[in-house]
Amino acid sequence: MKNILIVSSTKNSNFELSNNIKDFFKNKDGVSSSVISLEDYNLPLFKPSLEEDYKRNNSFPEDIEKVKNLIISSDALIWCSPEYNGGISPILTNVIAWISRATDDWKDGFKDKHSLICTSSGG
């Protein structure tokens, strides 16, 4: 069975979009899907000095580990994020930075995964 993780950056219309996508996969054979909202996790703002502290102590915060493990254990990723000033949301940028730094190899969280990027934006 293929495990699709749908990552919503926010709890606004993109969270609703994430749940609509999950509903789409509900009756598909061989597919399971789940939705997380990054707003549900207490993720510190990434900065190299903080990363060094965590690595020195061999311990990243629990919520970073939770999100990292969800992403690593998925077969595919769907990212639902609003557009902020012509780019992705800050919370999504932050989680991508943490996942790439909290793994042994920066690619471990994302390699060999199909990804889809979608948005619900009012502008």
Segments predicted by a language model, with ranges:
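Short, glycine-/small-residue-rich phosphate/pyrophosphate-handling segment
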Residues: G109-G123
